[in-house]
């Protein structure tokens, strides 16, 4: 009998660490399904989920404080292996009879762990491990039946284990790339200790998603709002593989897209992949609604409302469509559930994840709702979507609506499109595009004096923006070569009539945000 990709699973309890989603992504990368739930989950929910192993994440709280988070007692009564990471190790130690104390020496950054004894967690690893620490408190006394399996110069219990019960704790973060052997440690736990198999692969995810879509919609028709972005594009390919021409995609051209993007979407999905796709040219409608609006939040809301109205009108023309496909991904689900209930594991379908009307009388098809963004990209490649589309830099939902500062006009959008295309083209030509995390151009609603030939010109200013980041929570401005910036500036000023000055944004995040609006 073929095993289902969800048959073996790891449960990750979230205590609030900034790295918790990274733990889940690493487990998926190993090839095992996992879910991320809030630490205060009910015992009945854990029983129903029936995990093969449980990971307790790090977190910002202190075990020494009253009312700080604790793992549900059932975690330790369930008989399944448990791995505590950072705060997770501390609460494990304290709950099982050990002691945790505050430390005058906060350990943050690289450290060397000396591995002692033999532990399944460190199988096939060197006895000295470079790891990433981020903690103030530390375990000062381990519970009975545990042994020390790792220490640093300042942390006597950097790792502990109860091999019989398959309980493990590490004070460092194996999920971050700074911990060189971290992925191997997680593999040792997930595959070795928990006994899971690598069932979670791009091929098996696609096979499972297609089967579930077929079962869910049967012979009904499905409608999808296709933006040309990663998520909706992968949904389009999955649903089309499942039901073929019973899928209709609606592509709304709002006039706020990148240069030639509308035609590229139609060429790729209509001509190349043979999907049913309706293009709605709504540029005038969007620009009319945006007249006189300069506040960024007001612009975002206006763009969202007009999109909903346009999509709603088109969906009503498709009388036989009973299902709405959406590109909801797992981080959306986690964030949405946590904000509504405080418990991130409560996974319910609701239109507002995608920002569509509450009164749409359609069922939801969300084939990506279990997937992280990196997984979506991988299955997109498997489905035949081009690499350069799947791995393009992020583009905001409101498009150029938040890259034209202040009021939006067609003239401004047209100038910005052409300037941005030159910047991106030159980044590719110089082999710099994939060396920065995000790059784009911003239109500034100010005029500046310039000289062209023998005459003076009084035209608009654009700013180039390029950043390097791992998680987009913080970012450094990219130190692009001066010669490169000079070339881009010259091309924009010479080739885009209406722009007289180009500047480069050297602000980090914080204090600035990556986007200007």
Swiss-Prot record:
It is an enzyme of class 6 (ligase). ATP binds at residues 227-233. Residues 9-199 form the Glutamine amidotransferase type-1 domain. GO terms for cellular component: cytosol. Pathway: Purine metabolism; GMP biosynthesis; GMP from XMP (L-Gln route): step 1/1. Keywords: ATP-binding, Glutamine amidotransferase, GMP biosynthesis, Ligase, Nucleotide-binding, Purine biosynthesis. GO terms for molecular function: ATP binding; GMP synthase activity. Its EC number is 6.3.5.2. The active site is at residues 86, 173, 175. Residues 200-392 form the GMPS ATP-PPase domain. It catalyses: XMP + L-glutamine + ATP + H2O = GMP + L-glutamate + AMP + diphosphate + 2 H(+). InterPro entries: Class_I_gatase-like, GATASE, GMP_synth_C, GMP_synth_GATase, GMP_synthase, GMPS_ATP_PPase_dom, NAD/GMP_synthase, Rossmann-like_a/b/a_fold. It holds the Pfam family GATase. Homodimer. Catalyzes the synthesis of GMP from XMP. This is GMP synthase [glutamine-hydrolyzing]. The gene is guaA.
């Amino acid at each position: 009998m073929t095993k289902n990709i969800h048959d073996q699973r790891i449960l990750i309890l979230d205590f609030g660490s900034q790295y918790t989603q990274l733990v889940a992504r690493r487990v998926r990368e190993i090839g095992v399904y996992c879910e991320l739930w809030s630490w205060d989950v009910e015992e009945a929910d854990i029983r129903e989920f029936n995990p093969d192993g449980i990971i307790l994440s790090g977190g910002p709280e202190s075990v020494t404080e009253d009312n700080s988070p604790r793992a549900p007692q059932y975690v330790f009564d369930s008989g399944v292996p448990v791995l505590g990471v950072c705060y997770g190790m501390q609460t494990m130690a304290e709950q099982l009879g050990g002691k945790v104390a505050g430390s005058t020496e906060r350990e943050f950054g690289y450290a060397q762990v000396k591995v002692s004894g033999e532990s399944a967690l460190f199988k096939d690893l060197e006895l000295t491990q470079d790891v990433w620490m981020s903690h103030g408190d530390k375990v000062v006394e381990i519970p009975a039946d545990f042994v020390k399996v790792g220490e640093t110069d300042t942390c006597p219990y950097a790792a502990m284990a109860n091999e019989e019960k398959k309980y493990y704790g590490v004070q460092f973060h194996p999920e971050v790339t700074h911990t060189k052997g971290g992925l191997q440690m997680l593999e040792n736990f997930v595959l070795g200790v928990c006994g899971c198999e690598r069932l979670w692969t791009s091929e098996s995810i696609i096979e499972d998603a297609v089967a579930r879509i077929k079962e869910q919609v049967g012979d009904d028709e499905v409608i999808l709002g296709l933006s040309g972005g990663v998520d909706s594009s992968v949904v389009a390919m999955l649903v089309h593989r499942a039901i073929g021409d019973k899928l209709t995609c609606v592509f709304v051209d709002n006039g706020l897209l990148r240069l030639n993007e509308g035609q590229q979407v139609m060429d790729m999905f209509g001509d190349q992949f043979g999907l049913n796709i309706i293009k709605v040219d709504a540029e005038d409608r969007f620009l009319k609604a945006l007249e006189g609006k300069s506040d960024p939040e007001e612009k975002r809301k206006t763009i969202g409302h007009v999109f909903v109205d346009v999509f709603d009108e088109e969906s009503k023309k498709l009388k036989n469509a009973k299902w709405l496909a959406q590109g909801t991904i797992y981080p959306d689900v986690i964030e949405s559930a946590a904000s509504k209930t405080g418990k991130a594991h409560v996974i319910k379908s609701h239109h507002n994840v995608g920002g569509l009307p509450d009164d749409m009388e359609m069922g939801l098809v969300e084939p990506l709702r279990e997937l992280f963004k990196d997984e979506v990209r991988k299955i997109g490649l498997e489905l035949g979507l081009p690499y350069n589309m799947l791995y393009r830099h992020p583009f905001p939902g409101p498009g150029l609506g938040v890259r034209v500062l202040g009021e939006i006009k067609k003239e401004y959008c047209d100038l910005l499109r052409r300037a941005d295309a030159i910047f991106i083209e030159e980044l590719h030509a110089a082999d710099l595009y994939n060396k920065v995390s995000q790059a784009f151009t911003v239109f500034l609603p100010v005029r500046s004096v310039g000289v062209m030939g023998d005459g003076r010109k009084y035209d608009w200013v654009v700013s180039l923006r390029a950043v390097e980041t791992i998680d987009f929570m913080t970012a450094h401005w990219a130190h692009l070569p001066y010669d490169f910036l000079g070339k881009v500036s010259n091309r924009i000023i010479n080739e885009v009539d209406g722009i007289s000055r180009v500047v480069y944004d050297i602000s980090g995040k914080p204090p600035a945000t990556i986007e200007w609006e």
